[in-house]
Amino acid sequence: MEARTLDQLPGWARALLDEGRVARLGLVDEAGTPRVLPVTYAVYEGAIWSAVDRKPKRPGEPARVRYLRRRPQAALTVDRYSDDWSELCWVQALGRVEIIGAGSAPEPLEVLGAKYVAYREEPPPGPLLKLTPERLICWRAAE
């Protein structure tokens, strides 16, 4: 099934997106090579937000931020795996990513903090990534 906005997703797909703990962010690096990164995320006001957190990274601007400055299109996938394959499902959001400076969007950071204890204890210092879906695709085995 496809949708244009988060509100158009079927209930099971929206619940998966809201309750999921880890997403996979697909983007393209400077050489044109596809990359997929696990990210934490939260849904807020029609967009999917992720933060560049305090986990160890190389010095300088994080690679994902560099890649998205160059090519701001990305795909984010949240899935549920089960050994009972009748329970398999996923939601994918494709769209443009905005890089929002640290401290410029306190509300999404609060939503991330409500979802992830580590963010409440030590808020992420880096920028926020705001993916605004242009297309959403969802699938589940039970249909």
What are these regions (language model features)?
Residues 1-11, 81-143:
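Charged, gly/pro-rich active-site loop segments
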Residues 1-27:
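Short, conserved active-site entrance elements at the starts or edges of catalytic domains
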Residues 10, 61-62:
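Structural motif corresponding to alpha-helix initiation and N-cap regions
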Residues 18-20, 33-34, 90, 122-124:
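Short solvent-exposed loop/turn micro-motifs enriched in small/polar/acidic residues
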Residues 21-57, 76-79:
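Short beta-strand segments
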Residues 57-59, 112:
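Short gly/ser/thr-rich secondary-structure transition/capping motifs
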Residues 71-73:
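Short coil-to-beta transition motif at edge beta-strands of beta-rich domains
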